[in-house]
Design a protein with these regions (language model features):
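TRNA-recognition modules of translation machinery and tRNA-sensing kinases, especially anticodon-binding
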Residues: 1-207
Length: 207
C-alpha cells in the first residue's frame, strides 16, 4: 500500500516484483541489476516500449551540498509552485520538487542545479565504472541529470525504465547503501535492486 497521496494513474493498493543484491558495493553489481531488469522486460516483450534513464546521485555528502543548492534555487519561487509543491518546499523536501506535477514546476526542475555539479571524484569514478560495466552488455540508455531519488538512504546509481513518450515508470531501482543503518544495522551495508509495478507491466503487455 502507498502511504502518500496517490498521483495520477497510481493506485493506493498495488503489486510489485523485484530483485535485490545485499552486502555488495561493487559498481558492476549496479550494472548487472540494470541488465537483469532489461532482460525481464525483454522476455515479457515490452522492452522496446520502454526507455532506460540512468543517473548518479552521489554520496550522502554530495547530496547535502546539493540540497543546499536546491534550497537556494527554490527560495522565492513559491508562486510558481502548485499547492503540493509549496507544501514540499515548506517541509524542505527539495528533492521531491524535481518530480513536477505542473508545467511551471517542470520548467523549474529543468532549470534547477543538477546533482552532477556536486559529485566528489570518488562518486564520479563509481559512476564511470558502473557505465563501463553496463556498456559491455550493449543495451541502450540515456543519462538523465534530473533523475533523482528523494529517499535519503539512496546513493550513487539510480535508474528507471519508463514507458516511451510518457513519465509512467515501469521498473525503478538504484543503490541504497544507507538503508542498512537506517533500519538498525551497525555498519553501512551495500545494497542495490529494483522494483516493477505488476499492474503497469501487465497493462503495457496488453497494449
Amino acid at each position: 500500500f502507498r502511504f502518500e497521496r496517490p498521483k495520477s494513474r497510481t493506485q493506493r493498493e498495488f503489486w510489485q516484483f523485484g530483485a535485490e543484491v545485499i552486502g555488495e558495493s561493487d559498481p558492476a553489481i549496479d550494472a548487472q541489476i540494470i541488465y537483469l531488469g532489461h532482460r525481464i522486460l525483454s522476455d515479457l516483450g515490452i522492452r522496446e516500449h520502454c526507455e532506460l534513464k540512468i543517473n548518479t546521485i552521489g554520496s550522502v555528502e554530495d547530496r547535502e551540498k546539493y540540497l543546499d543548492a536546491l534550497a537556494n534555487f527554490y527560495a522565492g519561487k513559491e508562486r510558481s509552485l502548485s499547492p503540493t509543491g509549496r507544501e514540499k518546499l515548506e517541509q524542505k523536501k527539495y528533492l521531491d520538487l524535481l518530480d513536477p506535477r505542473t508545467e511551471d514546476e517542470e520548467v523549474l526542475a529543468k532549470m534547477a542545479p543538477k546533482i552532477t555539479e556536486f559529485l566528489s571524484p570518488d562518486s564520479q569514478e563509481f559512476f564511470d565504472q558502473m557505465l563501463s560495466s553496463l556498456n559491455s552488455f550493449g543495451i541502450e540508455y540515456t543519462i538523465d541529470p534530473t533523475l533523482i531519488r528523494p529517499l535519503q538512504y539512496y546513493s550513487q546509481t539510480t535508474f528507471e525504465f519508463r514507458k516511451k513518450d510518457s513519465r509512467e515508470k515501469i521498473l525503478v531501482g538504484g543503490r541504497y547503501d544507507g538503508l542498512g543503518k537506517k533500519i538498525g544495522h551497525e555498519k553501512v551495508l551495500g545494497g542495490c535492486g529494483f522494483a516493477a509495478g505488476m499492474e503497469r507491466t501487465i497493462a503495457l503487455m496488453k497494449e
